[in-house]
Swiss-Prot record:
Database matches in CDD domains: NAL
Known EC number: 4.1.3.3
Entry-linked InterPro entries: Aldolase_TIM, DapA-like, NanA, Schiff_base-form_aldolases_AS, Schiff_base-form_aldolases_CS
Catalytic activity: aceneuramate = aldehydo-N-acetyl-D-mannosamine + pyruvate
Pfam families with a match to the protein in the record: DHDPS
Name recorded for this polypeptide: N-acetylneuraminate lyase
Pathway: Amino-sugar metabolism; N-acetylneuraminate degradation; D-fructose 6-phosphate from N-acetylneuraminate: step 1/5
Function according to Swiss-Prot or TrEMBL: Catalyzes the reversible aldol cleavage of N-acetylneuraminic acid (sialic acid; Neu5Ac) to form pyruvate and N-acetylmannosamine (ManNAc) via a Schiff base intermediate.
Species name: Escherichia coli (strain SMS-3-5 / SECEC)
Cellular component, GO, one term: cytosol
Active site: Y137 (proton donor), K165 (schiff-base intermediate with substrate)
Record key words, sorted: Carbohydrate metabolism, Cytoplasm, Lyase, Schiff base
Similarity-based family: Belongs to the DapA family. NanA subfamily.
Binding site for aceneuramate: S47, T48, T167, G189, D191, E192, S208
Gene for this chain: nanA
Length: 297
């Protein structure tokens, strides 16, 4: 059901203007930039997209704009997860209406929900998605929900689930999931271990830094398919040098600043309470943007 979802999917950023409103023109440019750099698909409205500091209406607007720009060109996954099941269902129905290829949802967080409540949450979203496959989103470091291997196995075998986004550094668990579910579409979620995640069994990845250097991650996939571990490791090292800088600057605001210097995003701001990039990092980010533009050609 979800085998066509394998690949390298950029976790799409959401541009805002100086007044903190959605910057629709920059969003359209960013979608086109990702298409042009050879990405396989977009994961829209997730952590990187600052979904949880947006209203439901804004999240729907983002889904609609992305679909207008990219439907039929690349694969589209709508992250519809909210703490509220009803709001998640509303977004899932919108994703279906706009023509997305799949929906995704993080485990409901903040309140200590039981595991059966988590399962019921996913079942309800799957029902509202009306046939779109579900990508379960496991990100314990941010959600605070630490699923056991048995619980993951239960979630990914719910009717309608076709994939798992595994944002965890536990590569042993990644391999265990692959061993248990050979046909499951499995995404690596941490960009800094992309090559290792593929070797542990992932089919591809969903990541924030793909927005600025997606071709490098495609290069890792190609190298590993050809058995060229040395090239894959070299590319991963180059990606990780970028990630080192972004961790210092703040990942989302750092990415937006690089894209600003690339003339893709007009205003390099995240939505409050996120603050701007410290000015001392601007020269490094500008140099990075120039390096990546030259590398991309």
């Amino acid at each position: 059901m979800a085998t066509n979802l394998r690949g390298v999917m950029a976790a799409l950023l959401t541009p805002f203007d100086q007044q903190q409103a959605l910057d629709k023109a920059s969003l359209r440019r960013l979608v086109q930039f990702n298409i042009q750099q050879g990405i396989d698909g977009l994961y829209v409205g997730g952590s990187t997209g600052e979904a949880f500091v947006q209203s439901l209406s804004e999240r729907e607007q983002v889904l609609e704009i992305v679909a207008e720009e990219a439907k039929g060109k690349i694969k589209l996954i709508a992250h519809v997860g909210c703490v509220s099941t009803a709001e998640s269902q509303q977004l899932a129905a919108s994703a279906k209406r706009y023509g997305f290829d799949a929906v995704s949802a993080v485990t409901p967080f903040y309140y200590p929900f039981s595991f059966e409540e988590h399962c019921d949450h996913y079942r309800a979203i799957i029902d509202s998605a009306d046939g779109l496959p579900m990508v379960v989103y496991n990100i314990p470091a941010l959600s605070g929900v630490k699923l056991s291997l048995d619980q993951i196995n239960t979630l990914v075998t719910l009717p309608g689930v076709g994939a798992l986004k595994q944002t965890s550094g536990d590569l042993y668990q990644m391999e265990q999931i692959r061993r248990e579910h050979p046909d499951l579409v499995l995404y690596n979620g941490y960009d800094e271990i992309f090559a290792s995640g593929l070797l542990a069994g992932a089919d591809g990845g969903i990541g924030s830094t793909y927005n600025i250097m997606g071709w490098r991650y495609q290069g890792i996939v190609k190298a590993l398919k050809e058995g060229d571990i040395q090239t894959a490791q070299k590319l991963q090292t180059e990606c990780n040098k970028v990630i080192d800088l972004l961790i210092k600057t703040g990942v989302f605001r750092g990415l937006k600043t690089v894209l600003h210097y690339m003339d893709v995003v007009s205003v390099p701001l995240c939505r409050k309470p996120f603050g701007p990039v410290d000015e001392k990092y601007l020269p490094e980010l500008k140099a990075l943007a120039q390096q990546l533009m030259q590398e991309r050609g």
